[in-house]
C-alpha cells in the first residue's frame, strides 16, 4: 500500500495544452483513484515551475493550470506546495537565475531547492503527529468534482484493444 503520494502535473498539463476540464479530470482521476484504492494514503499536490509561469507570478497572477489543480486539492482537502511561486520569487529576488535552476527539468541546484522545500514541509507535518498516532482513513467526497474524471481508468492488455475506423495494427 502507498503511505504517501506526491502528485504534480502543472508543467505537463500546461505544456501539453490540456484544457481546464481535462486538467481537473486528470488530476482528480489520480487523487480519487488513489484514495479509493487506499483511503489511508496521504497525498501532497506539488506545483512545479514552467518558463511561462515566471512572467505571471511577478504580476500577481497564478497560472490557470495551478488554479484548476487547486480545485481538486481543495475538494479532497489535500495540501499543496506552490514550488513554482517560490522559485519565481527567488529568481525575482536574484538568488539564482533560470539557467542556474535548470529550467523546466531542473539541474542539481533546482532539485536541491525542491528537496529543501519538501523537507521543510515534512518536518512541519511530522511535528504535528506522534509515531503512536493511529493512521486515519481520508473520506472520499461524493459526488466526484467532475463525474467524468478519469478515476476509473485502468490498464488493459493490448489484445483487448478494438481499433476504430481509420486505425490499423
Residue ranges, per PLM feature:
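Alpha-helical cap/lid subdomain in secreted, periplasmic
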Residues: 2-134
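Conserved catalytic region of serine esterases and O-acyltransferases that act on ester linkages
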Residues: 112-169
Amino acid at each position: 500500500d502507498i503511505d504517501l503520494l506526491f502528485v504534480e502535473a502543472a508543467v505537463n498539463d500546461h505544456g501539453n495544452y490540456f484544457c481546464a476540464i481535462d486538467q481537473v479530470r486528470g488530476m482528480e482521476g489520480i487523487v480519487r483513484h488513489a484514495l479509493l484504492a487506499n483511503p489511508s494514503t496521504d497525498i501532497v499536490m506539488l506545483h512545479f515551475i514552467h518558463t511561462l509561469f515566471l512572467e505571471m507570478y511577478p504580476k500577481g497572477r497564478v497560472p490557470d493550470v495551478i488554479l484548476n489543480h487547486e480545485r481538486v486539492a481543495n475538494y479532497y482537502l489535500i495540501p499543496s506546495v506552490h514550488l513554482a511561486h517560490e522559485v519565481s520569487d527567488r529568481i525575482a529576488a536574484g538568488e539564482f537565475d533560470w539557467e542556474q535552476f535548470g529550467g523546466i527539468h531542473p539541474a542539481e541546484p533546482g532539485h536541491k531547492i525542491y528537496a529543501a522545500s519538501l523537507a521543510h514541509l515534512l518536518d512541519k507535518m511530522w511535528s504535528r503527529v506522534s509515531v503512536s498516532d493511529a493512521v486515519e482513513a481520508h473520506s472520499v467526497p461524493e459526488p466526484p468534482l467532475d463525474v467524468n474524471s478519469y478515476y476509473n481508468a485502468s490498464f488493459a492488455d493490448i489484445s483487448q484493444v478494438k481499433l476504430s475506423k481509420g486505425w490499423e495494427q
